Each structure stands twice: as structure tokens, then as C-alpha cells.
Regions:
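Short, Lys/Arg-rich, polar N-terminal cytosolic tail immediately upstream
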Residues: 1-16
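Short, hydrophobic transmembrane alpha-helix segments
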Residues: 37-46, 69-70
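Surface-exposed interaction/gating patches
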Residues: 129, 133-159
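Cytoplasmic-side transmembrane-helix entry/capping segments in multi-pass membrane proteins
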Residues: 74-84, 107-110, 132-143
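Structural signature of hydrophobic alpha-helical transmembrane segments
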Residues: 44-58, 101-115, 157
């Protein structure tokens, strides 16, 4: 994808990939790497879920800052942020379940409520929910926040 503008309005073209077979293959690989990384830090290195979540949240913040600051779609940056969301999702889901003792059902309902709230605020703030294209910084922030919380929800539901 190039650094062109959409309809001459100055909006950047989409910085998210098209959803194709290749997308799903890379998504599965990124999820596997993220879950493995989350478990490695929290369990194998025995840092615990809270510390691991904070480390991966910092990693996510750095990666998403590069993604949002980019002028065009960069696959490496995009997928790095996706891996970051899966590592945060893994450790945060386990923190809610095991450390706080909420269990996966309660955690899932809390996370679902958070996703719904984010989507509602996104819609109210921007007038739409743009999943297939992020043409403004505000949309991109909402997009990544939704991805972060929904990945955590997906981990809780999967466990």
C-alpha cells in the first residue's frame, strides 16, 4: 500500500491489511507467538501475570505508537502490534482468572462489557466504527484499543 490520500481529503489510506487467506495464516501465527510469549514470561520465567501484563502493555504501547505514527501500512509494524495484543491478552486474561480469582466466565463478561463500551464510545465519537480502514488517528486508536480488549476476551473464552 502506498502513502496516497483517499479522495483527496488528506485522509491516509487504510493501514490495516485486507482480510485474505494470507491474513488468517499470519494471524494464527501471530496469536501462537503471542500466547507462547505471554506464557513464557508469566510462567516459565515466573514473573507472574501482573508483572508480565505490565511488561507486555509497555511493549504494546511502544509498538502501537509506531503503528499510529506511520504514514502508511507497514506489515512488520502492524503484525508486531498484533503480537503485542495477544501477549497482553494472554497474561491479562490469566491475571483476571487466576490472580484475581474471577474465573473465565466473570472475566469474559467484564471484557465483553468493555468491548461493547469501547465500540459505543467509538461510534458516538466518530459517527461510525471503521474496522476495515483506519483513516484517522482517532479511528486507529479505537481500532487498536478494541483489538487489545477483544484479544483478551478471546483468550478468556478460549481458556
Amino acid at each position: 500500500m502506498t502513502d496516497q490520500t483517499a479522495a483527496g481529503r488528506g485522509d491516509l489510506l487504510s493501514k490495516v491489511p485486507a482480510v485474505t487467506l494470507a491474513f488468517w495464516i499470519v494471524k494464527i501465527c501471530a496469536t501462537t507467538v503471542g500466547e507462547t510469549g505471554g506464557d513464557a514470561l508469566s510462567m516459565r520465567l515466573n514473573l507472574g501475570y501482573a508483572v508480565s501484563s505490565l511488561i507486555f502493555l509497555a511493549f504494546f504501547a511502544i509498538a502501537v505508537t509506531f503503528q499510529i505514527g506511520a504514514k502508511r501500512y507497514h506489515p512488520l509494524i502492524y503484525w508486531l502490534v498484533v503480537v503485542a495484543t495477544t501477549t497482553v491478552g494472554t497474561t491479562t486474561s490469566d491475571y483476571l482468572d487466576r490472580t484475581l480469582g474471577l474465573g473465565y466466565v466473570k472475566s469474559s463478561f467484564i471484557l465483553l462489557a468493555m468491548v461493547i463500551a469501547i465500540l459505543a464510545v467509538w461510534r458516538r465519537t466518530t459517527g461510525s466504527i471503521a474496522f476495515d480502514h483506519s483513516t484517522s488517528r482517532k479511528n486507529e486508536i479505537f481500532y487498536w484499543l478494541t483489538r487489545l480488549v477483544s484479544n483478551t476476551l478471546g483468550t478468556a473464552l478460549g481458556d
